[in-house]
Amino acid sequence: MKILVTGHLGFIGSHVYEHFIQQGHQVDGYDIPHDLGDFKTEKKYDLVVHLAANAAIREAIENPDAFWENNVTKSIPIFEYCRKNNVRCLYASSASVYEWWINAYGITKKVNEIQAPPNSVGMRFFNVYAEKVSRSDMLYRMLEDKTATYLTRHKRDWVHVKDIVSAIALLAESDYTGVLDVGTANPVAVIDLATKMGMGHLPIKEETPGERDITCADITELQKLGWSPTINILDTVK
């Protein structure tokens, strides 16, 4: 296949890009220094994997206009290319859409699901992580780097980037359209993960406004396609 991966220099995008190359596909990447808002091409791709986005919540608070520009406005040329050329599109959504009104990131991902062309799949990623990667899930990274200062009683659905890649690879070959969750359906308590990583001694913060007590993916649709996660976060840490 001829595949375009946006955000191919990012955390998830770099893994997806390398996977498709290793599988023998013709793969183009589109990322910094290019501007998605200026995206134009005469090439005919078989698949677009749109992973370019800004997930920095602090920036969303400090500069919401720029955040909207990056995640919503600059997605328009990508989606329009797919719509006009009837190209299948897999795009990054987020578990944040389930309470999209809480922060600007969730809002932009909810809008992406509305923007997306008919022949597309919105992938609602949960807490994506990988060992020793600076752009991994923030809480996981803080525990790994020993920089966390407190814990919470929350449970989170941490999904390894390798499982994300395998889900995307499967969806690339399927004819599924719509939106679906990509996670493990096996949430792990922050306290349990911290204890396994030698950080269980930290104080517990009881009040965390705006955060869900538990996140848990419903992976029924992916399981119907033959996918299941293979990595449990508690098995990857020491």
Which stretches of residues belong to each language-model region?
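N-terminal Rossmann NAD(P)H-binding glycine-rich loop of SDR-like oxidoreductase domains
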Residues: I3-Q22
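Adenosine-cofactor binding site in Rossmann-like domains, unifying the SAM/SAH pocket
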Residues: Q26-T41
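NAD(P)H-binding glycine-rich loop region in Rossmannoid oxidoreductase-like domains
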Residues: K40-N70, E99
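NAD(P)-dependent short-chain dehydrogenase/reductase
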Residues: I102-G106, K110, I114-L170, K196-M197
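C-terminal "lid/loop" region of Rossmann-like NAD(P)-dependent oxidoreductases
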Residues: L151-R153, V179-L180, V188-T195, M199-I219
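Amphipathic terminal alpha-helices
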Residues: N232-K238
